[in-house]
């Protein structure tokens, strides 16, 4: 029996929600280990759609403990709202079903304001964030001035920490021409929300270590995609946290040996939200067709996603940087009916063929995709639950992806419904 880490292997929006829900039904504990409420998950269970952005997917499953790890930045006001919204759908969340790391960093209103200012002040410098304060909160964490969950329990210490925090932020805001933050007002806001957050606070690293030693199945739920990783992604058009599988250990307080099986979620084509390089992007009618069929709009922002052909070079890179053992291939049905389909196998840069996306921002913008073209299929793959139900050419496409990325398919998803899944290998049984 293995613990399982789920990571997006592209730029996010790969369909992790459905796969995580399928795995969460088998897990005892589901852990979020990075990011914040900037990445949405959509779950469809018995005809009901649940949209999550901060809470682990396990919250909609009775009998499963959900954990927000220390690697997550937590907006306490959003957390309260998300819990209330799920409550209206019949999902009850209590301290018995949800734990939050007491050493997790808080997102404050000043973080959201700074994020929004940076994204709107100069269009040429825009990264394409969700403007929800994620990046500025991580900056304060690394700068050793962050307010953490545990600080809400000590009013005197909280006041001192706010003073230290504002010594930095108000100097910055003066330089930017933004109104300064009143420390007393911020303290009042935090003390008001504290009673709704502190009951969930716990020493998460100890809780998870106990669960591991007891042989409980732990599912580590990644948000976004590894190509947005602050180190291994398309920098600077990335998020502000590490997303690769190794972060599951750091962001939860467990050792690397606790990770177990790494499952990469891979869409059968490629999408991206926001700015940044996208070698296989299709700006023509084909790209529009893929986007319309795949309903490619962000869960959190509603932004239209950019669409393109499958990029095997990028996914192969992620397989290596995350140590992916197997993949879950999603949205194969969106490619039904295409006469031909292209797969990017590498790039052309200055007359040379390279097999990975270079680190240089300038080179990333200049690479040209090298494609191979395969025949498509006209039969439907939607709703298939066995290999026998798939068209031969669709199987050929899947097998070619496996060859090019160096990882095998463990699960194949053919619709948003959780049961429309072809299981090849259960990651928990590795």
Swiss-Prot record:
Function recorded in the entry: Plays an important role in the de novo pathway of purine nucleotide biosynthesis. Catalyzes the first committed step in the biosynthesis of AMP from IMP.
Protein name: Adenylosuccinate synthetase
Keywords (A to Z) from UniProt: Cytoplasm, GTP-binding, Ligase, Magnesium, Metal-binding, Nucleotide-binding, Purine biosynthesis
Keyword set includes Disulfide bond: no
UniProt GO cellular component terms: cytoplasm
Entry annotation: catalytic residues: 13 (proton acceptor), 41 (proton donor)
Classification via CDD domains: AdSS
Entry EC number(s): 6.3.4.4
Sites where the protein binds substrate: 299-305
GO BP term, example: 'de novo' AMP biosynthetic process
Cofactor: Mg(2+)
Domain of life, per lineage: Bacteria
Keyword Acyltransferase among record annotations: no
Pfam families attached to this UniProt entry: Adenylsucc_synt
Binding site for IMP: 13-16, 38-41, 130, 144, 224, 239, 303
Record Gene3D superfamilies: Adenylosuccinate Synthetase, subunit A, domain 1 (3.40.440.10), Adenylosuccinate Synthetase, subunit A, domain 2 (1.10.300.10), Adenylosuccinate Synthetase, subunit A, domain 3 (3.90.170.10)
HAMAP family the record matches: Adenylosucc_synth (MF_00011)
Gene: purA
Record's catalysed reaction(s): IMP + L-aspartate + GTP = N(6)-(1,2-dicarboxyethyl)-AMP + GDP + phosphate + 2 H(+)
């Amino acid at each position: 029996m293995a613990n399982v880490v789920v990571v997006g292997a592209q730029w996010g929006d790969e369909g992790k929600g459905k796969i995580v829900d399928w795995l969460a039904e088998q897990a005892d504990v589901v852990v979020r280990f990075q990011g914040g409420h900037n990445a949405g998950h959509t779950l469809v269970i018995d005809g009901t759609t649940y949209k999550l952005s901060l809470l682990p997917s396990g919250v909609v499953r009775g009998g499963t403990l959900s954990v927000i790890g220390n690697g997550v930045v937590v907006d306490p006001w959003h957390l309260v709202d998300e819990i209330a919204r799920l409550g209206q759908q019949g999902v009850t969340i209590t301290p018995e079903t949800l734990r939050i790391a007491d050493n997790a960093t808080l997102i404050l209103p000043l973080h959201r304001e700074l994020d929004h200012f940076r994204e709107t002040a100069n269009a040429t410098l825009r990264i394409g964030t969700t403007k929800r304060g994620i990046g500025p909160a991580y900056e304060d964490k690394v700068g050793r001035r962050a307010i953490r969950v545990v600080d809400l329990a000590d009013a005197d210490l909280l006041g001192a920490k706010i003073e230290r925090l504002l010594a930095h932020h108000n100097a910055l805001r003066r330089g930017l021409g933004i109104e300064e933050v009143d420390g007393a007002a911020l303290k009042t806001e935090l003390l008001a929300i504290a009673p709704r957050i502190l009951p969930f606070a716990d020493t998460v690293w100890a809780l998870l270590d106990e669960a591991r030693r007891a042989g409980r199945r732990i599912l580590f739920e990644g948000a976004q995609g590894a190509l947005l990783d602050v180190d291994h992604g398309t920098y600077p058009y990335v998020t502000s946290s590490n997303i690769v599988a190794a972060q599951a250990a750091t962001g939860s307080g467990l050792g690397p040996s606790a990770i177990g099986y790494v499952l990469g979620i891979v869409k059968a084509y490629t999408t991206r939200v926001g700015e940044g390089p996208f070698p296989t992007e299709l700006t023509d009618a084909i790209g529009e067709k893929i986007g319309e069929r795949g309903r490619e709009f962000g869960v959190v922002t509603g932004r239209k996603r950019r669409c393109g052909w499958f990029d095997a070079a990028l996914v192969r890179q992620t397989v290596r940087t995350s140590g992916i053992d197997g993949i879950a291939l999603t949205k194969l049905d969106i490619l039904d009916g295409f006469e031909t389909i292209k797969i990017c196998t590498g790039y052309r840069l200055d007359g040379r063929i390279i097999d990975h996306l270079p680190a240089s921002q300038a080179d990333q913008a200049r690479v040209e995709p090298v494609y191979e073209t395969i025949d498509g299929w006209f039969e439907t793959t939607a709703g298939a639950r066995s290999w026998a139900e798939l068209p031969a050419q669709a199987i050929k496409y899947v097998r070619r992806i496996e060859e090019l990325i160096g990882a095998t398919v463990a699960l194949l998803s053919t619709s948003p419904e959780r049961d429309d899944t072809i299981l090849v290998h259960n990651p928990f049984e590795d």
